[in-house]
Design a protein with these regions (language model features):
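P-loop NTP-binding/switch modules centered on Walker-like glycine-rich loops
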Residues: 94, 215-219, 223-305
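A short, flexible loop at the N-terminus of ABC-type nucleotide-binding domains that lies
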Residues: 38-42, 51-64, 95-101, 118-121, ...
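A short, proline-enriched helix->beta-strand linker immediately N-terminal to the Walker B motif
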Residues: 208-212
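Conserved ABC ATPase "signature" region
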Residues: 113, 165-184, 293
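Short catalytic/signature loops enriched in Gly
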Residues: 180-183, 274-382
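The feature captures the beta-strand-to-loop junction immediately N-terminal to the Walker
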Residues: 78-79
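Conserved ABC transporter NBD signature motif
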Residues: 102-113
Length: 394
């Protein structure tokens, strides 16, 4: 299934407009933000390991994850629950709590190592240089304070301005994110706003200090498709006009096809495939990614049953000895059950983004060789499965 097919189906629901390869690589609109500098990684995550040390054992929620975020681009993190997407984001934000801990790797923000900052140093950059939008705005906003005051608090924490100046900034950011009657909404409580408006408040809070990077953890999951389309357009506008880099965590491959520039597919705490968005859809390589795309319902299909990848994400306390996906993969061989594959490069786009796949099928191959590997979804018969739900490393 190529990207255009996914977009056609997604746009039928959201009313979005498909991008072409050219404007996905050059930007849908001219980028005017200071951060929109070609070829610069504003955030790098190198070999990150975040483990949870529980009474039952060690849970490798994030294991050897490397992600590069160019300035002014949207990076998609996709995969099933339990894949490590949210835990990667929480590690970057310094929000892991006991018994979770970053045990290895390096996180660099604009050239500065932020992996092990103390609480005071972390507070200086969180919400200021890097911010996060959480999945459910109703639980992220304090119900007993007006939403305007909550956004104002972030400004007063990071900027030397008066309360009156901070209030004016809040009203301006409410206008930018499309909140009607911003002066009135400043004094509204969360329960007085719709889900879409609450999410716009959260986006405004994340953007008010003009951070270099914004992490959006499934920001449209609780919204209807009309509001989802509005939020996605807003995120693209922030990227295009302000040069903001965005990490978008989602299950929705249609959303990925619509807004993302680069994609990382995660499974059981590891990156299984990474590529420029067009390359991922046109040259889908890892059996897991193929299965995800094959699972998308087709509008013109007469099939009575939807395709699924059999089995569940493995229990992170009892991962397979070999490839994390081997128990669900129809292409698994004896080697896959005993050895863990590395990330093998099979090509690169014009901007230097490598297409990499964590699968022995592509070991030592280039893009031309990779094209010869059989495509399509995996034979959805699992070699084995203990049937247990994974530890929550989503």
């Amino acid at each position: 299934m190529n990207r255009e097919h996914v977009l056609t189906q997604d746009n039928a629901l959201t009313g979005g407009n498909a991008r072409t390869r050219d404007n996905a690589q050059t930007g849908d609109h001219a980028r005017t933000g200071d951060n929109a500098q070609t070829g610069k990684y504003v955030l790098t995550i190198e070999n990150l390991q975040s483990y949870f040390f529980t009474a039952k054992g060690t849970v490798p929620a994030v294991d050897d994850v490397t992600i590069e975020v160019p300035a002014g681009k949207i990076i998609g993190l996709v995969g099933e629950s339990g894949g490590g997407k949210s835990m990667t984001a929480m590690s970057v934000m310094g929000l892991l709590r006991h018994p979770g801990k970053v045990v290895g790797g390096r996180i660099t923000l604009d050239g500065r190592d932020i992996t092990y900052l103390n609480p005071r140093e972390r507070a200086r950059i969180r919400g200021n240089e890097i911010s996060m939008i959480f999945q459910e705005p109703m639980t992220s906003l304090n119900p007993v304070y007006p939403v305007g005051r909550q956004v104002q608090e972030a400004i007063l924490l990071h900027q030397k301005v008066s309360r009156a100046e901070a209030k004016q900034q809040v009203i301006e950011i409410f206008k930018e994110v499309g909140i009607p009657e911003p002066e009135k909404r400043y004094n509204s409580y969360p329960h007085q706003l719709s889900g879409g408006l609450r999410q716009r408040v959260m986006i405004g809070m994340a953007m008010v200090c003009k951070p270099k990077v914004m992490i959006a953890d499934e920001p449209t999951t609780a919204l209807d498709v009309t509001i989802e389309a509005q939020i996605l357009r807003l995120m693209k506008r922030l990227r295009d006009e302000q040069g903001t880099s965005i990490i978008l965590i989602t299950h929705n491959m249609g959303v990925v096809a619509e807004v993302c520039d680069y994609v990382y597919v995660m499974y059981a705490g590891m990156v299984m495939e990474q590529a420029e968005v067009f390359d991922l859809f046109e040259n889908t390589s890892h059996p897991y990614t193929q299965g995800l795309l094959k699972s998308i319902p087709k509008l013109d299909s007469r099939e009575e049953r939807l395709y699924t990848i059999e089995g569940v994400v493995p229990n992170l306390l009892r991962l397979p000895e070999g490839c994390n996906f081997c128990n669900r993969c129809g292409k698994a061989e004896a080697r896959c059950l005993k050895e863990k594959p590395g990330l093998y490069g099979i090509g690169a786009d014009g901007n230097g983004m490598s297409h990499k796949v964590r699968c022995f099928l592509y070991e030592g191959m280039g893009m031309e060789d990779a094209g010869a590997v059989e495509s399509g979804g995996p034979d959805a018969q699992a070699t084995s499965s203990d049937g247990e739900v994974a530890e929550d490393g989503r």
